[in-house]
Amino acid sequence: MTKLYIFDTTLRDGEQTPGVNLNKEEKLEIAKQLAKLNVDIIEAGFPIASPGEFEAVKTIAENVKGPVIAALARAIPMDIDRAWEAIKYSESPRIHTFIATSDIHIEKKLKKTRDEVLEQAVSAVKYAKRYCSDVEFSAEDAVRSDFNFLVKIFEAVIDAGATVINIPDTVGYALPWEFGDLIRRLKENIKNIDKAIVSVHCHNDLGLATANSLSAIVNGAEQVECTINGLGERAGNAAMEEIVMAIKVRRLPFEVGIKTEEIYKTSKLVSNLTGIVIQPNKAIVGENAFAHESGIHQHGVIQDPSTYEIIDPKMIGIPESKIVLGKHSGKHAFEKRLQELGYSLPPEQLEEAFKKFKELADKKKEITDKDIEALVSNQIKLVPEYYRLVHLQVVSGIGIVPTATIIISEDGEEIKTVEIGNGPVDAVYKAIAKAIKIPHSLEDFSLKSVTGGTDALGEAMVKLSDKDGNIYVGRATSTDIVEASALAYLRALNQLVMLKGKG
């Protein structure tokens, strides 16, 4: 069977999802799980983007073993230098350099000629080869590029030493039969194509990223670039779990090294750390992917799951457990269930999570997996508590002006404020904003029930923006929805401070 390389770009292209801001520790946590998933290549980031991004890529390169660790760089020496400095300690480093090749990008964005772009691409690959034997070249907006120019530039960069050539559908414009045909024609016309791996990178603007990727694979692509849960700019990227499971379920003749039993754990980890909720009807990993409401379907599944399920849930690692957790459950049972759900917490975080679990168990008769995931997501969101909620009291009701009294701890000092609002949450947020004088704006607030029942956990989500328009997301859970709302607001503010400082 033909080997298919899985290139995961969750930490680079996936992190460009609006509202996603991962810190170094969170990126490392995801990278380690991607290594367990057994992806072939991890694109760890874009080192030139910021000092924090550089440190995150460097940390991953130094600590994650197994996959190739790639760093993105524009086709300019400064970017390539920075990329190499970040990944040089990896046991398998790759520099991934790119330049746009479509006429609209060349003329409008780059303000160059085709010849100048060709020269810059070749120079960049030669420059990268001085550092690294494994160099990937991407022709940005390849789908809208002139075919003959694509052939010319790919032949030139392969001669310059590129080991991988990548054909991106940057704006998600292609249709599956068109994209597959493009890959086939490129393979037929690039004279030195046998010296490089052909890669594809599909965006989902028309909802066709997975279909386009599969079409490319059956037409000769040997590497597919994708993200967990389909994260990415605009409508996202091709979802890794969809591509892999399509190949596995349909028994396509390609060798894929992914450990599919790690898919569910990886999906949940990425969702919890990025704060991007998986849509319920998302293929493979959505909450409803294995749910059946129709009576006819339910009857069939009870008799034989294969009547309506083409994938065994165990195949992607969805845990099956008969253990019911409650207030009498001990730490061992709690930790075992965490491991089944894909979480591995260090001792201090495990202790804090277990403490929260026991507090919740005193309020709820039965603890569900969703409750546990909600609790643990608060523990693994590795953001320092610059501001900590010490006290919260709200007075509200019919005929009463909602009033919030809060005490927040900052560097050991307590700040007390009182504010009124249009409702209890509004009053709390005004009190927090009064106590913490950091320029920001509230962009969005939502509240949902994690599970059913009057004793359910409520999950609050807050989006804040700074003066530059950057988005920071905070989430928190509690059986008290006002408390959850306050904690979510503070977590978003703490993330802002962590990334931007208090100025």
Swiss-Prot record:
Record keyword Aminoacyl-tRNA synthetase present: no
Domain Pyruvate carboxyltransferase: residue ranges: 4-264
Show the segment(s) annotated as Regulatory domain: 388-503
Q: Which cofactor does it need?
A: Mn(2+)
Could you tell me the keywords of this UniProt record?
Answer: Amino-acid biosynthesis, Branched-chain amino acid biosynthesis, Cytoplasm, Leucine biosynthesis, Manganese, Metal-binding, Transferase
Output the InterPro entries linked to this UniProt entry: 2-IPM_HCS-like, 2-isopropylmalate_synth_dimer, AIPM/Hcit_synth_CS, Aldolase_TIM, LeuA/HCS_post-cat, LeuA_allosteric_dom_sf, LeuA_bact_synth, PYR_CT
Q: List its EC numbers.
A: 2.3.3.13
Biological role stated in the UniProt entry: Catalyzes the condensation of the acetyl group of acetyl-CoA with 3-methyl-2-oxobutanoate (2-ketoisovalerate) to form 3-carboxy-3-hydroxy-4-methylpentanoate (2-isopropylmalate).
Q: Which family does it belong to?
A: Belongs to the alpha-IPM synthase/homocitrate synthase family. LeuA type 1 subfamily.
- PANTHER family in the record: 2-ISOPROPYLMALATE SYNTHASE 1, CHLOROPLASTIC-RELATED, HOMOCITRATE SYNTHASE-RELATED
Q: What is this protein called?
A: 2-isopropylmalate synthase
- Phylogenetic classification of the source organism: Bacteria, Pseudomonadati, Dictyoglomota, Dictyoglomia, Dictyoglomales
